C-alpha cells in the first residue's frame, strides 16, 4: 500500500476540495451533455452548507432539478427545504416530493439512489462512507471539505476517487 505523507495528503485534499468551486460549471456541462434531460440532484446533509450548495446548483442551469434530500434529522431537512423555497421564490420551481425526503443515518442511500449528481455536505466523519456508496452506484459527487477526519477515511476517499476516475465520474 502506498504511504500517505503530509505533502500528498494536502495536495489530494486541495484537489478534491477544489471541485466545490466548479459546481456551477460542471453541472452546466453535465446538464447540457445529456440531451436536454433534467439532471437529477440530491443533497445529503441539509445544514447551511448543503442548503447553500443546492441553491447554487439550481441556479447554475435550468435543467438541474432537486429530486431528493437526506439528513440525519428531519427538522434540519424541512428547515433546509423551506430556506431553498424562500431563496428561489418564483425564480426556480423546486418540488421535492415528501416520499423523497429521507431522515436517519441510512437516509443517504435512498437519496443517492434517486440522483445523477449528489452534493455531500454532511459532517466529515461520514463523508468517506457516503462518497464510496455514491461512486459504487455511478453517481457524480460534489463534497464539502475536509473529505474525512482520519487516515482510514482519507484512504477510503482516495480509493473511491480512483474508482470514480475509472468510471469517468466527477
Regions picked out by a protein language model, each given a short descriptive name:
Residues 1-139, 156-168:
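N-terminal glycine-/serine-/threonine-rich beta1-alpha1-beta2 phosphate-ribose binding loop
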Residues 75-76, 148-152:
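Short gly/pro/ser/thr-enriched loop/turn and capping motifs at secondary-structure boundaries
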Residues 137-150:
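ADP-ribose/adenylate-binding Rossmann-like module
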Amino acid at each position: 500500500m502506498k504511504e500517505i505523507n503530509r505533502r500528498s495528503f494536502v495536495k489530494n485534499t486541495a484537489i478534491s476540495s477544489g471541485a466545490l468551486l466548479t459546481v456551477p460549471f460542471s453541472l452546466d456541462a453535465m446538464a447540457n451533455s445529456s440531451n436536454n434531460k433534467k439532471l437529477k440532484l440530491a443533497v445529503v446533509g441539509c445544514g447551511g452548507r448543503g442548503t447553500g450548495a443546492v441553491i447554487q446548483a439550481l441556479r447554475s442551469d435550468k435543467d438541474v432539478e432537486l429530486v431528493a434530500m437526506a439528513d440525519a434529522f428531519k427538522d434540519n431537512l424541512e428547515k433546509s427545504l423551506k430556506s431553498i423555497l424562500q431563496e428561489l421564490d418564483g425564480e426556480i420551481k423546486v418540488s421535492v416530493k415528501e416520499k423523497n425526503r429521507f431522515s436517519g443515518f441510512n437516509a443517504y442511500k435512498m437519496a443517492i439512489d434517486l440522483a445523477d449528481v449528489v452534493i455531500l455536505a454532511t459532517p466529515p466523519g461520514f463523508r468517506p462512507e457516503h462518497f464510496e456508496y455514491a461512486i459504487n452506484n455511478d453517481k457524480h459527487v460534489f463534497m464539502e471539505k475536509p473529505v474525512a477526519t482520519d487516515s482510514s477515511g482519507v484512504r477510503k476517499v482516495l480509493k473511491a476517487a480512483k474508482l470514480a476516475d475509472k468510471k469517468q465520474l466527477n
